[in-house]
């Protein structure tokens, strides 16, 4: 039964719906892990003081391009 202010799916009424709920949970976990890994890499890249003379200073825009899809997915 669905409840007001419920964030997830309602209770499954069939075996197919139960499998769909498991798939949804699994897919969200994968998205969360990928987003966390990308965020960690961005934080490490931005906070480290090591630079390469061939790297252009466009890290801010690259960071935005990488973070925006994660924000949209959330």
Swiss-Prot record:
Its cofactor is Cu cation. GO terms for cellular component: mitochondrial inner membrane; respiratory chain complex IV. The keyword Coiled coil does not apply. InterPro entries: CcO_II (IPR045187), Cyt_c_oxidase_su2_TM_dom (IPR011759), Cyt_c_oxidase_su2_TM_sf (IPR036257). GO terms for molecular function: cytochrome-c oxidase activity. PROSITE patterns: COX2_TM (PS50999). It catalyses: 4 Fe(II)-[cytochrome c] + O2 + 8 H(+)(in) = 4 Fe(III)-[cytochrome c] + 2 H2O + 4 H(+)(out). The keyword Transmembrane applies. Gene3D superfamilies: 1.10.287.90. It is found in: Mitochondrion inner membrane. Belongs to the cytochrome c oxidase subunit 2 family. Component of the cytochrome c oxidase (complex IV, CIV), a multisubunit enzyme composed of 14 subunits. The complex is composed of a catalytic core of 3 subunits MT-CO1, MT-CO2 and MT-CO3, encoded in the mitochondrial DNA, and 11 supernumerary subunits COX4I, COX5A, COX5B, COX6A, COX6B, COX6C, COX7A, COX7B, COX7C, COX8 and NDUFA4, which are encoded in the nuclear genome. This is Cytochrome c oxidase subunit 2. The lineage of its organism: Eukaryota, Metazoa, Chordata, Craniata, Vertebrata. The gene is mt-co2.
